[in-house]
């Protein structure tokens, strides 16, 4: 094999054999020099990155007579090494010297030069902190330690590279900046909390707007046809009506809609149909009539008991302006208050078209008020309308006794709210079929003759059994106004048609 690719040992042995041919002295000298070169260590083995020694490959022979190379570490790195390798992370100046000489043989010579540099770096660099000696251990000199903020001054923990010169003021400035950034973040978080509350408030407002159908309001009345005293009374009554409607919806919402039906879905959540339970016009006469009816309801609790035995319902007050139904032949003459007997069905029952008001004004000339289309009745029962106290029972019902005051009885469900007690109108109103555009039609079934007869009989029984209490109602009627004087309602028909046309046109 060629000597270039041969083993280093075989080449040495070959060199020794050839050299032995010239003389024994020269051969011994060559062998000793080769063994010395193989045994010599590479001067940079202690700083090498590789675990193996460079002398194994014969690299130590050319450098065997040169001095040891200086370590590639700065004096700051050497001092930091000594401090971090100490037991308590603090060491004296003499301890630093000992660590450096034990670790790096280069510093074993020329001690005066590098030890002076160590003291100089300890004094000038702020990363080294001098700690007074407080223990009773033997020795002299203070301890040296590293500043807590300077532990990361070396890049990735390597002592060969330092990021920058450590300065305490820079560290303090960085800390202040970090505190300021944290304070700014806290302020931003504090500003975001009111925004969150506002967002929740907007969501709640949207939720209330989505459920605004529960709180129905009356359509705005065009008060141009009213003047003076009537305008103020109408505005006040409409505002009171809105408040009562909202309170009763919250208090008795479950009672008004007892079960799930298609009619309940269409009636309750349709604004135009939902108004069937409220009167469209509220004035002094209507308020007086309602108050009179309430007083009659309180004074005649016994009459309510008799009516309950007949109809299995609780006595209730109906609106006194409802015209007679188709199933009963009503008569009206004289100037006495109205007598109505109406057995109500469930609350919010029946259909209603916006063209027809819940009630018709009673003519003052003593003639019977006849609806426009008597062939269509939105009532489930019939009513008897009299001015002189003489009742004619429809379909076999008996007549009632005479009197000068009104007797108003009806029999709805016992758990109705206060709003329905005052404003329930849709059970006894006549409806006009059709609309200006033909979009709405009345779809209620006609009244039953047997129900009309039963209601008339109940009214006659109550009137005949409680005629001795009529003087209370005469006084009340005198104080609140005559119910027969209803001529101020003549404006109602064209006025209702006017704003209902706009309601249908714009979907109000």
Swiss-Prot record:
Residues 69-160 bind DNA. This is Fork head domain-containing protein crocodile. Residues 319-412 are annotated as: Disordered. GO terms for biological process: anatomical structure morphogenesis; cell differentiation; regulation of transcription by RNA polymerase II; specification of segmental identity, head. InterPro entries: Fork_head_dom, FOX_domain-containing, TF_fork_head_CS_1, TF_fork_head_CS_2, WH-like_DNA-bd_sf, WH_DNA-bd_sf. It is found in: Nucleus. The keyword Oxidoreductase does not apply. Residues 375-389 have a biased composition (Low complexity). It comes from Drosophila melanogaster (Fruit fly). One of its GO terms (cellular component) is nucleus. GO terms for molecular function: DNA binding; DNA-binding transcription factor activity, RNA polymerase II-specific; RNA polymerase II cis-regulatory region sequence-specific DNA binding. SMART domains: FH. The gene is croc. Expressed in early blastoderm embryos in anterior and posterior gut precursors, and, later in a subset of cells in central nervous system. Required for the establishment of head structures. Required to function as an early patterning gene in the anterior-most blastoderm head segment anlage and for the establishment of a specific head skeletal structure that derives from the non-adjacent intercalary segment at a later stage of embryogenesis. Binds the consensus DNA sequence 5'-[AG]TAAA[TC]A-3'. Its main location: nucleus. Residues 390-404 have a biased composition (Gly residues). Keywords: Developmental protein, DNA-binding, Nucleus, Transcription, Transcription regulation.
């Amino acid at each position: 094999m060629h000597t270039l690719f041969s083993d280093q040992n075989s080449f040495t042995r070959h060199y020794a054999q050839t050299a032995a041919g010239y003389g024994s002295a020269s051969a011994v000298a060559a062998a000793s020099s080769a063994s010395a070169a193989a045994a010599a260590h590479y001067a940079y083995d202690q700083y090498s990155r590789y675990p193996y020694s460079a002398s194994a490959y014969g690299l130590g022979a050319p450098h065997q007579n040169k001095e040891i190379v200086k370590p590639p570490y700065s004096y700051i790195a050497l001092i930091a090494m000594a401090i971090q390798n100490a037991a308590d992370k603090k060491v004296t100046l003499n301890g630093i010297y000992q660590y450096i000489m034990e670790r790096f043989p280069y510093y074993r010579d020329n001690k005066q030069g590098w030890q002076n540099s160590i003291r100089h770096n300890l004094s000038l660099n702020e990363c080294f902190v001098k700690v007074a000696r407080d223990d009773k251990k033997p020795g002299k000199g203070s301890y040296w330690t590293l500043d807590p903020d300077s532990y990361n001054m070396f890049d990735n923990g390597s002592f060969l590279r330092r990021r920058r010169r450590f300065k305490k003021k820079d560290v303090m400035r960085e800390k202040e900046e970090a505190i300021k950034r944290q304070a700014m973040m806290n302020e931003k978080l504090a500003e975001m909390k009111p925004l969150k509350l506002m967002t929740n408030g907007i969501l709640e407002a949207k939720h209330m707007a989505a459920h605004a159908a529960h709180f129905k309001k009356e359509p705005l009345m065009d008060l141009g046809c009213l003047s003076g005293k009537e305008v103020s009374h109408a505005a006040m009554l409409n505002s009171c009506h809105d408040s009562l409607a909202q309170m009763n919806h919250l208090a008795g919402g479950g009672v008004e809609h007892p079960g799930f039906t298609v009619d309940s879905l269409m009636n309750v959540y349709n604004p135009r149909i939902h108004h069937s339970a409220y009167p469209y016009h509220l004035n002094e006469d209507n308020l007086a009539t309602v108050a009179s009816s309430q007083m009659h309801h309180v004074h005649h609790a016994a009459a309510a008991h008799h009516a309950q035995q007949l109809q299995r319902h609780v006595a209730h007050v109906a609106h006194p302006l409802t015209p007679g139904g188709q199933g009963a032949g009503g008569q009206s003459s004289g100037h006495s208050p109205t007598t109505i007997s109406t057995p109500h069905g469930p609350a919010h029952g029946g259909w209603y078209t916006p063209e027809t008001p819940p009630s018709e004004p009673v003519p003052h000339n003593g003639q019977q008020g006849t609806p426009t289309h008597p062939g269509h009745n939105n009532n489930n029962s019939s009513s008897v309308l009299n001015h002189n106290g003489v009742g004619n029972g429809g379909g076999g019902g008996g007549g009632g006794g005479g009197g000068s005051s009104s007797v108003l009885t009806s029999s709805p469900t016992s758990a109705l709210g206060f709003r329905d007690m005052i404003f329930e109108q849709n059970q006894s109103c006549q409806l006009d079929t059709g609309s200006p555009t033909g979009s709405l039609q009345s779809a209620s079934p006609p009244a039953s003759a047997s129900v009309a007869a039963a209601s008339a009989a109940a009214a006659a029984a109550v009137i005949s059994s409680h005629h001795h209490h009529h003087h209370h109602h005469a006084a009340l009627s005198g104080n609140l106004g005559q119910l027969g004087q209803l001529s101020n309602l003549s404006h109602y028909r064209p006025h209702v048609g006017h704003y209902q046309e706009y309601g249908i046109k714009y979907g109000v």
